[in-house]
Amino acid sequence: SPATRPAYSVLENKKLNDETTYDITVDGKYVYYLSKDDQEKYSLKRMNLEDEKVETIYNEQCEFFINDQFIYLSNGSQILQMNKENLETKTIKEVENRTMVLVGNKIIYASSTKVNCMNLSGKDDHVLFKNVVARNLQVLGNDIFMEGYEQSDGETFCVFNNEGQRYYLGENQTETFENVQDA
């Protein structure tokens, strides 16, 4: 029997809009992205791949991550959970944060001089690392790559899991890691 195809198909070599877009993520029948308008204001939008309809779902610059049911957003002062179906949004944590990632059923976020881990409802929040200013967190399977600055050691690059076990990368390892990441 022929393979079942969705009602939409991936469009090739077709311009979908003229917006300046960042952080493009495809999830099911939607493409989610950050858009910047002429006044340099950011918003989170999604485009339906079936009818190419675009809707603004959040009116601030943010980082966002998607799982089966929710979109998790960080706007720098709070972490929010948005239902993908009805777009209902609730704050799960009021916290200044520099960056965050979603790993399985955990949210890892950096604030001030700490890296914390909490569950998807904002509970069980605990510190993974102290005395570190994380500039960048990226998911690598079940692990997280962190670029930052430690008060005791200066510039740091490491890989850690959501339990806080980490492996420091030296200069040569970092270059190799970046090459693998870009592959």
Locate the predicted segments by residue.
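Residue position within the beta-strands of beta-propeller blades
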Residues: 32-34, 72-73, 109-110, 145-148
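Eukaryotic tandem repeat interaction scaffolds
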Residues: 92-103, 107-111, 116-117
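Repeated scaffold domains used in trafficking and secretory/extracellular systems
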Residues: 19-27, 59-68, 96-104, 132-141, ...
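Short loop/turn segments that connect beta-strands within the blades of beta-propeller domains
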Residues: 27, 40, 67, 75-76, ...
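Surface-exposed loop/turn elements that mediate protein-protein interactions on large endomembrane-trafficking
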Residues: 1-16, 39-56, 78-93, 114-130, ...
